[in-house]
Amino acid sequence: TGHIIAAANAVIAPAADRMKASHDIAIDRKRSKGPPGGEMAALDPVAHGRVQVLDCPSGDVAQAMAAVDELVRLSRLDPEWSWSRAAIIARDWRRLTPARAYAESLGIPVEMANESMPSIWRLREMQQFIDALRRDTTRLLAIRDLVDVLNAIPSNRWTDLIAEGIAALAKELANKTMPVPDLVEWFAEWANDARSDQRSLLLLTAHRSKGVEFDDVVILNGGWDRPSKGEDPDAPRRLFYVAMTRARRSLAIIADGQHPFVQQGAEHVLRRAAPAIGADVALPTALYQVPDLKTVDLSWAGRLRTGHPSIASISAAKVGDPVHIVREGPTWMIQDAQGQALGRMAKSWSPPERLSFLRGEVGAIVRWRKSDNQEEYRVHLHRDVWEAIIPELVFG
């Protein structure tokens, strides 16, 4: 919007080493006929599309809560709101942890840009879906057939994700049919591409934000006033400018007193106090570890001999089932509610220091094969194909 561009240009103007020589960025011609506040000029009765500077008490937790609360406020103004078009940007990852915990506590879907999603193709649900398609490779299937196949699989967040894939294919296929081998290939490509799609409120650093845009952005305070080692004095200002220009529709900036870059008094900026946090609000301290293949010994179940009780327990396990982690020698085991081992964490994994294990659940179940392992390790494997449990863990 005009207001976001005016604020960003004012921030970058003092920088000695201009990113684009003497050319200020300008608004898209298609948008230039609209109000400088864009659609938020009419939608937001508080800021009217101006860039907000929210004055907030110091501390990572207070500002994280102010940032999330501001996005919640905006979400209530827009019936078309999607958390997948919103982001909170910080100078470093550490400041984003409380924002993650607070968003989770409010039930807001949230993801950190430095976390990787499990391989969609390897998910139990995806493999069941593909196995069902492959039962007869001579068929021509329509979208309704794919929906029927998916509906036969117990539903969870991963079947919801596959449903997104079917919806994407429906745009291409419409009322036509497609041969099974082509469908399998299409879903393999989609699974690879879909891993990088944003589906939730995204938390990321300014460095990571380069090249992506969001409708609504809040920038956290902290770390902007000093260059990192080896950086020139203008580097933080240029990085802050990058963060500001990620916002297409609305931009809020958290400050504690005078902001190092955003000056007061400009017509495109509204400075106001962030709403006070009530005394009854539980401050977020939880640390979330999302399902990540790198944290688990993926071949543990492949080393089990036929008849081992863990094999049946893994088959019976469902996404969302409670798990806990138990130390066993130098490693940590994943156990179900009955105390049966479901898997083992990677040797390189350990719980975060000074935090207690609060709860855990089966986050994902992936199919792994003997052929996925290097030749020298295959001698220890007693099965050709197995499932590995990938937990989601919460510490606090």
Where are the regions a protein language model picked out?
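Conserved coupling/interface region of RecA-like P-loop/ASCE motor cores
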Residues: 1-36
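Alpha-helical scaffold elements adjacent to nucleotide-binding pockets in ATP/GTP-utilizing enzyme cores
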Residues: 3-11, 66, 70, 98-105, ...
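Core RecA-like ATPase module of SF1/SF2 helicases and allied nucleic-acid translocases
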Residues: 72, 76-234, 247-251, 271-282
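Conserved active-site motif detector
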Residues: 265-396
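Well-ordered alpha-helical segments embedded in enzymatic catalytic cores
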Residues: 63-73, 239
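Accessory/regulatory regions of helicases
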Residues: 51, 227-299
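Glycine-rich phosphate-binding "P-loop"
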Residues: 36-66
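Short, conserved phosphate/pyrophosphate- and ester-handling motifs at nucleotide-, phospho-/glycolipid
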Residues: 1, 211, 346
